[in-house]
Each structure stands twice: as structure tokens, then as C-alpha cells.
């Protein structure tokens, strides 16, 4: 007989404004504890020193995580010019310096090469796997890694401010798998002056915004209370980028069993991904074909 998972069957999203100095996994564990939830996960890792939106999926909402990780995200960050570090952020040992400082115009011109479809090499200290091991574990042991470049879509990358000659504040909107530390490193190299991330904040991720997130202090304060539970957003929030199709009663019953079910289509095209609802509740995600949704994920709500 299978072991029953302990905790409450809560499904939805809790948006956290992650503080610096805390790992994304630690935030998820705190949320799970505070809500006594059976299951939780996050939609996109933030570095420990980074702040901003961390969307925590609970229960059946974990099935919608891929739609958030695939969505566009926005980052604001400060690049420290003139210094290169082992980790490409302020926590690492300085390994190279330069007295050169680019002008605002030179920075603006260099940013053009980092927009659109680019190839990006992850930082040495990253969660990328190398022959089954995490890159950061190998890097800590002193190994210099030859990491392969990966494609990244950069929707926009703009200068927000130039506080002084040593710093430039940028804002980037990008797709899945982007490393802001790599942008800072590569920009510094392109400008001939080195660079690393001084600080980093994710301001939004898909439909979730940092300004709507709650602090870890609030989670501690409201732990195990109905007040915290009331802050959990509906599961459907994670499906905001997909069209919704109302299911017929018979269609909903079939979808819940994993079978194609009849839906009421509007302007959804054949072969398009969508999600079905019945009486206001998400039922399944799948592919629309000829009046039916063919489910790929079914929600047990």
C-alpha cells in the first residue's frame, strides 16, 4: 500500500518577494511548512543573493509550472564595471580588473548584440549539469569548465540609470533559461572592461509581479493561519497565457478520466494548446481538436 502524503491538499499559487541571502528551495520549504501543504515547488530559480518574485506552486498547480518557466520574465540589475569575479556576481573572488570605463553611448551600442535570439554560456557557478554533476560543485573544486552555449530569447535590454562610472543599471525581459550573471560578464568583455552583477531583482515572471508578493517575514507571521491561506491565488493564474475553453458536463467527466472531452470553442484553432474549465474550475490542459480537448495534464480538484 502506498504511503499517504502528510499535509493539506492545497492547490494554487503563493507569490513571494524573495529576500537576498535565501535560496529558492528554502523559500519553498518555508511556504510548505507555513501552509502545511502536501506539495509545493517553484517556477524558476533565483540565485541566493537575488531578490524579487518567486512564484510557489502548491498541489495541483505544480502541473502548471512549465507554463510559468516558459513565460517571459523581467529583471532589473546593476552591473559593476571594471571587475570580473569567479561567480560573476558580488559574492565571488575578484579574478581580473580594468581601469577602462565605457561611455553611456558605448554601453548602449554594445547592448544591441544581446537582444533577440542570442547564444549564452552559463556561469561557471550554475546549476547546469556536466556529466551528471552540477557545474557549481565542480567549480568549487577548482575545475575550469567548458560549458556549451545555450539559446536565449532576449525581448528587451535597456539602460535604466548610470549612477557613476563604475556602475550601470539595466532592465532585461527574456525567455526561459537566461542567466543575468552571464549578461553582465559578457557585456563587460564586449566593452573591454570586465563586469559582474552587483545586485539583481526579478520584477515579474509571467503573470506574477514582485509588488504583489508577500515577504518571508509575513509568511512567518501568518504561518498556519487562514489569513495566509487567503493569500493563495487560484491555480488558473498559472494558465494565463493559454485560452480557456468551457467544457460540457459530459466533456468534463471524460477529461477528468484522461480522455478527450467536448468543449465550447471560440476562436481557438485546431492543434492549439488550451485549458478546459467546468463550473469555474480548471479541469485539464491539452490540445484542441475538432470540438474536443485532448488532455495532457488533468487536475484533481
Curated annotation (Swiss-Prot):
Keywords noted in UniProt: Isomerase, tRNA processing
Keyword check for Isomerase: yes
MF terms (GO), sorted A to Z: RNA binding; tRNA pseudouridine(55) synthase activity
EC code: 5.4.99.25
Active site: 47
Enzyme class: isomerase
Matching Pfam families: TruB_C_2, TruB_N
Biological process per Gene Ontology, one example term: mRNA pseudouridine synthesis
Catalytically driven reaction(s): uridine(55) in tRNA = pseudouridine(55) in tRNA
InterPro entries attached to this UniProt entry: PsdUridine_synth_cat_dom_sf, PsdUridine_synth_N, tRNA_psdUridine_synth_TruB, TruB_C
Keyword Plastid on entry: no
Alphabetical list of HAMAP family matching this protein: TruB_bact (MF_01080)
Family indicated by similarity: Belongs to the pseudouridine synthase TruB family. Type 1 subfamily.
Cited function: Responsible for synthesis of pseudouridine from uracil-55 in the psi GC loop of transfer RNAs.
NCBIfam families registered for this protein in UniProt: TruB
Name of the protein this chain belongs to: tRNA pseudouridine synthase B
Source organism of this protein record: Cereibacter sphaeroides (strain ATCC 17029 / ATH 2.4.9) (Rhodobacter sphaeroides)
